[in-house]
């Protein structure tokens, strides 16, 4: 490992040699038709009248025509009109804390560490794996991705360039996504958090990646230094755990001190963050001897550790939540990523993470030999705090602890069937699981709600996502029939097939750039801007009481399928509204892993019931489709 080199291959220009098309702008009429379909389903659950909604819709085409014309002009001049509006509304202007509310956790397979040296070694291997992947990105040696559909269209690779080169800087009213500039000296570094202290780990010097041995040596040095200074820390990591405006005010105060400004620049320019959590080892047992229920509990414990660090009293402040990638590695063997989501989607991060995991697993049991003399040393960052900044840190930590305590996480490892059986039933696995979640919500609450499932629009330049809404009229008719003892199996099967076809149609609309959410978001933003600048009336559709209910998501879902050679992985995140559920899922050939979440104190949710309903819905549909 001492002499290991990364191949410095020439850049592969085919990432950008073929210009991708701009996304289309859907027609007002098509978007309005789809919106009314979803509004009708939500209205049933709300027991609300659609009269005012239909009246507002009747006026909408006339009222929104100037907005549509303005949007068409923007689309002509902008690389991607959708991302221009979507990114600020989805992330940058949201004032809630990013932990739980926004930042997902990607849980890696647990590792058994016999010694502290094992912990440092595995962390160094994961770190080095990420650094090597960064090198592949820089030299464009990551193969350009293509869509999974029949056409195999080229996908935008911009997110790969951004994932380790962006930072979310808090601002009053709106955050800023900073693109880090490459330095002329060829030096790069990683931020390391250990015992709530901040350190720089040098990762590239004069253009050359430092050796694995130097990464491990620096981590060991950081652990030793942090132990000596552990009673002299002010918990700087608390800066990003609370409301975004408070985070911005904290840094406004801090940056009046020159030393703080220098340290902050080091932080913002770091490639990613490594969080070394030093705790007593926890014996979760061996995975192969666990029952399913024991394994689910172990998955849950790992999820809490990765998402929140179990709050400020444990490891929740040994984090830097404004960074895109936080690699969390605990001495208990728990490890994974905590992700600031505004920069990139899951598939990009999974591809990077799985490369690092394979690298670490390959070399972890190997005996490392290197020279005793090491010339690369980490750097400890210095901070000076005013009374005001200390008070803000304290308040941020209090908000964070409430969030961490409120997060309720469950894991369902459903191992009765998986992707293989679903394909044998001639159903899209993702569409199948989307309908399963509709049925589970109906079983739990007796109605459907607006549902979020991201659809990649990376076939367009600078494309991110739109929203596949699974709460269609066809889905409502099917789940209603499934709950009825009067409906025949044949009728239920007929309605299921209709719901599947509609799900496929809506999915195709979204990935082709004709979804409704990005379009409505842009129109709403333009209307709000006109009202603020000219006093022009906002279209009545945006003032309709049902609008806010249709545009919030009590069921937020995401497919995160991981590779077969890396088992025991899953992704999780908090619900996006207080009375809702988060429900990411991992579809494997013989099983499906669900990771539903909710907020403990909200009486409108029942996570245990919802988990049971997911399993029940899976069995119900298997029975429906089995001959």
From Swiss-Prot:
> Do the record's keywords include Zinc-finger?
no
Q: Which domain of life is it from?
A: Eukaryota
Residues holding CoA: 418-430, 456, 559
**Reactions this protein catalyses:** choline + acetyl-CoA = acetylcholine + CoA
> One Pfam annotation, family name?
Carn_acyltransf
Catalytic machinery residues: 341 (proton acceptor)
A GO term for molecular function? choline O-acetyltransferase activity
Q: Which GO CC annotations does the UniProt entry carry?
A: cytoplasm; cytosol; excitatory synapse; neuron projection; neuronal cell body; organelle membrane; plasma membrane; synapse
The annotated region (Disordered) lies at 1-20
Gene disruption phenotype? RNAi-mediated knockdown in SIA sublateral motor neurons results in abnormal sleep behavior whereby larvae display a defect in 'flipping,' which is a left-right turning behavior that occurs during sleep.
Looking at the UniProt entry, the stretches that span the membrane are none
Q: In which tissues is it expressed?
A: Expressed in SIA, SIB and SMB sublateral motor neurons.
Q: What is its EC number?
A: 2.3.1.6
Keywords, ordered alphabetically: Acyltransferase, Neurotransmitter biosynthesis, Transferase
Question: What is this protein for, i.e. what is its function?
Answer: Catalyzes the reversible synthesis of acetylcholine (ACh) from acetyl CoA and choline at cholinergic synapses. Required in SIA sublateral cholinergic motor neurons for a left-right turning behavior that occurs during the lethargus phase of the normal sleep process called 'flipping'. During 'flipping' animals rotate 180 degrees about their longitudinal axis.
Annotated family = Belongs to the carnitine/choline acetyltransferase family.
The family database entries (PANTHER family) matched by this protein are listed as: CARNITINE O-ACYLTRANSFERASE (PTHR22589), CHOLINE O-ACETYLTRANSFERASE (PTHR22589:SF14)
Q: What is this protein called?
A: Choline O-acetyltransferase
Please name the source species.
Answer: Caenorhabditis elegans
Q: Top-down, what is the taxonomic lineage of the species of origin?
A: Eukaryota, Metazoa, Ecdysozoa, Nematoda, Chromadorea
